[in-house]
Amino acid sequence: MKALLLDFGSVISKSLFERHELIEEKLNLSKGTLTWKGPFAPETDPLWMAMQRDEITERAYWGTRAREIGALVGEQNWSMTDLLQAIGGERIYDKVLRPQALKTIAICKQNGLKVGILSNEIELFTGKEWVENLPFINDLDSFYDATHSDILKPDPRAYQIALEQLNVLPNEVLFVDDQLRNIFGAIKCGLKTLHFDITEPDACFDYVRSVMGIELGI
């Protein structure tokens, strides 16, 4: 493998399911107010299951959750950007980004491997300033965010853009994403893939490092 290509939301950043306590704390909501748990407890989250069946988009899912949370604090029509800024924005990178992801990115770079991001909506959800100040942004060899484009995963063109930015062949890349539809899209384009399980981040990044031929501490 010559390059690691990562989705951002839920892969590099912790999912909002994992941030329920932080959201409740920052917004002064009672503990346990947020009951939808996505893949951690699918039976609690019919909307999540609808997304998994491709009945709604990921953007629609999170847009709904943002509006619901906004309504709990008396705000109407909150977007994901509104929500994330309300709980701390760029001030809480250490609570939002997965340490396993940051370590893996750093070790890849130390070993001369390329690292890129292929996302559908980083800036849409977090805001431009938040993206520009990501602590690892200058370590990336490629960055494609479809916030300002109509070319979204799993459109084959999205993967092709990332491959061109990385200047590698499809079989030289490991692509990691938490959404199965995006994994299928990558497979069709010839990329090696890992369907990221957000309930097992340690195991997933252990696998990533194994495939990339690197280890912690190198």
Predicted regions and their residues:
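Active-site neighborhood of HAD-like aspartate-dependent phosphohydrolases
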Residues: 1-43, 188-189, 200-203
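Alpha-helical elements of Rossmann-like donor-binding domains used by nucleotide-donor carbohydrate transfer enzymes
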Residues: 18-22, 46, 60, 64, ...
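A short acidic, helix-capping loop that chelates divalent metal ions and anchors anionic groups
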Residues: 45-49, 125-128
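Short, surface-exposed acidic
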Residues: 27-40, 70-86, 214-218
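Short, acidic loop-to-helix structural element flanking the phosphoryl-transfer center
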Residues: 73-116, 156
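Hydrophobic alpha-helical core bundles mediating ligand binding, dimerization, or RNAP-core interactions
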Residues: 20-23, 61-66, 87-91, 125-130
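Asp-based, Mg2+/Mn2+-dependent phosphohydrolase catalytic module
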Residues: 1-6, 118, 122-123, 127-218
